[in-house]
């Protein structure tokens, strides 16, 4: 039975790049800890074992992890990586229900150089079509187009380039319409934005200079008569 005004607190981080120990003691309390990818610095299973130990020390009752483009082990040695990650639920184009919330996680981002979990041109729709319609919290490593995806243009000074995925944006706005989309990947665009019924959160822990200085994003999921609503928590 749905409980009106039920509140579930999500603590969201991303892009720690192997520097997770440097944010120890800085994570607020919450019901679910979400890591939106790029856990690792060099992408090895050995690093993942260390991250797993760190996750086990965090007090949150539930933990969800997706991979990012730096997390090579999840693509090159997926069985070893999944075996090493025992302290969190790993989502890769898959979902889970926790505390009445439906989550879906996906590591893919548009092709950029020779990283991991890269979508080749033309593959985007097939990837995002997998997301079910009833997802409350969508966790993607990268942002949708023009939402917290701004980077400096490498060829023209003072110009901003939007590098998010337009097909992901279309899937979110036309089909899924989640209460919350958590992502990272674009360190420069850390922050949050509300657009229609969806709260978008870029939870990149590392700055553009790869310093783990950005605070965790804390979101309260509140159950209403019309379903779940996401709002930034007041700490």
Question: Predicted regions span which residues?
Answer:
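Active-site environment of divalent metal-dependent phosphoester hydrolases
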Residues: 17-23, 40-46, 69-77, 97, ...
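Binuclear metal-dependent phosphoesterase catalytic core
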Residues: 4, 95-99, 167-175, 179-180, ...
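Divalent metal-coordination and catalytic microenvironments
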Residues: 15, 37-38, 63, 68, ...
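Core catalytic region of metal-dependent phosphoesterases/phosphodiesterases
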Residues: 13, 18-98
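Hydrophobic, well-structured mid-protein blocks that either form specific transmembrane helices
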Residues: 83-130
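Active-site-proximal loop/helix segments of hydrolase catalytic cores
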Residues: 17, 23-26, 116-135, 139-150
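Active-site-proximal segments of metal-dependent phosphoesterases and phosphodiesterases across multiple
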Residues: 45, 53, 112, 133-179
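Active-site-proximal beta-strand elements of phosphoester/diester hydrolases
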Residues: 8-17, 100-109, 136-141, 199-205
């Amino acid at each position: 039975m749905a409980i009106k005004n039920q509140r579930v607190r999500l603590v969201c981080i991303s892009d720690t790049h192997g520097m997770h120990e440097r944010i120890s003691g800085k994570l607020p309390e919450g019901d679910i800890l979400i890591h939106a990818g790029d856990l690792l610095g060099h992408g090895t299973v050995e690093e993942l074992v260390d991250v797993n130990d760190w996750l086990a020390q965090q007090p949150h009752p539930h933990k969800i992890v997706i991979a990012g483009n730096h997390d090579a082990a999840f693509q090159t040695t997926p069985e070893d990586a999944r075996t090493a990650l025992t302290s969190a639920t790993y989502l890769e184009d898959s979902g889970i229900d926790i505390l009445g919330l439906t989550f879906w996680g996906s590591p893919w981002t548009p092709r950029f150089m020779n990283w991991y979990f890269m979508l080749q041109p033309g593959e985007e729709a097939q990837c995002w079509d997998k997301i079910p319609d009833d997802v409350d919290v969508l966790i993607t490593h990268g942002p949708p187009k023009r939402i917290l995806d701004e980077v400096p243009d490498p060829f023209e000074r003072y110009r901003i380039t939007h590098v998010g995925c337009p097909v992901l944006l279309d899937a979110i706005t036309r089909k899924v319409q989640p209460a919350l989309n958590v992502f990272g990947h674009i360190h420069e665009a850390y922050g949050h934005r509300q657009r229609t019924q969806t709260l978008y959160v870029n939870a990149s822990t590392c700055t553009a200079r790869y310093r783990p200085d950005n605070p965790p994003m804390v979101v309260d999921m509140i159950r209403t008569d019309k379903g779940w609503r996401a709002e930034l928590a007041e700490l």
